[in-house]
């Protein structure tokens, strides 16, 4: 397939950006402009899963801080594909890349043309000192139970109790698998390799045996305390954990940024608990923590961030995470994110999945291309 875009310049007015020869004719590339999301939805259809729904949100008008460039591919004047590349202030080592082509227009080289043009824009910005790298990362779901329609949840809609039609999880999985196969082949052909796996997992209530909680009957039991999401101590713990599990994509997350991006009011953080080796009043340190992003208990699993002190040894970290998770799911289900880099949590979750006490809602893979980095 042909599809390499020629040398291109950026046009802030949203006019013709460049043209590219593809199988079956030629396409026009131009900057993203208002209304493109609706026009593309007509040819793309609804996203196949929750991950694709999230990734489509990357597509937006160009910006300088954070730096972003988005292009739309038109065939015969009709938008059929789009792509975006943008920089993250928290993870400066690589730029995010997302490209999507209408199903009827795939295998014509349109995606390749978009990637080539976006790489060119990144190279220009890097040469001008606007961004620190041209290395890229992209992600896609290999499996999913959660559809791409906002508000749909397989946990609460399998029986139609919400008034919406039940989620057809088999259809979601089938569509996701088909899309993933094509996406992975495309990324590999573009020089990308896998670097990380990230899963959103729902854990059933009572899935883990409860530990003894410190009290008169159990003076050596675990110490569980509530913590303010504005706490400096909690924010420092979250920052240390985040940095430790992102060694594969190093972060520049300051304590202030962690408070804003992970714990602040805009995140929806509704409360937190910490597991200590002794009461705080006695100088006890945080061994593990959980931050809830669900304001009230409900039938659907609460969205929770679980982390631990990265200075703990493997055995101690495993125990701290198991104890905290057991207390979290004592009565209600939760859903958590677990990455390959989160070894203690991944080990526990894999055991729960194997015992049918947990299930994967979305299974996402991250691929990278570092060949053109800084």
Where are these regions (language model features)?
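Conserved acetyl-CoA-binding loop-helix of GNAT-fold acetyltransferases
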Residues: 107-124, 313-330
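A conserved beta-turn-beta hairpin within the catalytic core of GNAT-like acetyltransferases
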Residues: 87-98, 106, 131-133, 294-306
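A short, internal acetyl-CoA/4′-phosphopantetheine-binding micro-motif in the GNAT/acyltransferase core
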Residues: 98-108, 142, 302-317
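Conserved beta-hairpin
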Residues: 58-61, 67-85, 259-291
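Intrinsically disordered, low-complexity terminal tails and inter-domain linkers enriched
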Residues: 4-11, 15, 126-174, 206-223, ...
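Short amphipathic alpha-helix that is part of the acyltransferase structural core
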Residues: 1-59, 72-74, 210-255, 374
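Anionic, Ser/Thr-rich low-complexity intrinsically disordered regions
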Residues: 11, 16-23, 28-31, 38-41, ...
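Active-site/acyl-donor-binding loops of N-acyltransferases
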Residues: 2-4, 151-212, 329-374
């Amino acid at each position: 397939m042909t599809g390499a875009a020629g040398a291109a310049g950026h046009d802030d007015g949203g006019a013709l950006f460049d043209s590219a020869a593809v199988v079956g004719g030629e396409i026009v590339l131009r900057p993203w402009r208002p209304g493109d999301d609706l026009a593309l939805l007509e040819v793309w259809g609804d996203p196949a899963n929750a991950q694709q729904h999230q990734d489509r949100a990357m597509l937006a008008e160009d910006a300088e801080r954070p730096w972003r460039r988005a292009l739309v591919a038109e065939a015969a004047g009709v938008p059929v594909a789009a792509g975006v590349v943008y920089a993250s202030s928290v993870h400066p080592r690589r730029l995010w890349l997302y490209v999507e082509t209408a199903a009827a227009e795939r295998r014509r080289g349109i995606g390749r043309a978009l990637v080539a043009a976006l790489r060119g824009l990144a190279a220009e910005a890097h040469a001008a000192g606007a961004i620190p790298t041209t290395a890229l990362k992209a992600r896609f779901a290999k499996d999913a139970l959660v559809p791409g329609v906002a508000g749909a949840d397989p946990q609460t809609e399998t029986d139609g109790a919400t008034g919406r039609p039940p989620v057809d999880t088999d259809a979601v999985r089938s569509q996701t698998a088909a899309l993933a196969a094509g996406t992975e082949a495309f990324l590999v052909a573009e020089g990308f390799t896998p670097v990380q796996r990230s899963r959103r997992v729902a854990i059933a209530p009572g899935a883990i045996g409860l530990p003894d909680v410190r009290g008169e009957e159990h003076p050596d039991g675990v110490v569980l305390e509530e913590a303010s999401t504005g706490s400096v101590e909690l924010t420092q713990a979250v920052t240390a954990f985040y940095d430790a599990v992102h060694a594969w994509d190093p972060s520049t997350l300051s304590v202030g940024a962690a408070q804003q991006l992970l714990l602040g009011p805009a995140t929806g953080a509704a409360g937190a608990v910490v597991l200590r080796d002794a009461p705080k009043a006695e100088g006890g340190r945080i061994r593990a923590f959980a931050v809830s992003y669900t304001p009230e208990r409900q039938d659907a699993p609460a969205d929770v961030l679980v982390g631990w002190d990265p200075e703990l040894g493997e055995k101690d970290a495993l125990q701290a995470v198991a104890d905290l998770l057991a207390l979290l799911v004592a009565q209600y289900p939760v859903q958590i994110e677990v990455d390959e880099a989160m070894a203690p949590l991944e080990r526990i979750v894999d055991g729960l999945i194997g015992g049918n006490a947990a299930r994967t809602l979305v299974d996402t893979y991250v691929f990278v291309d570092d060949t053109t980095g800084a």
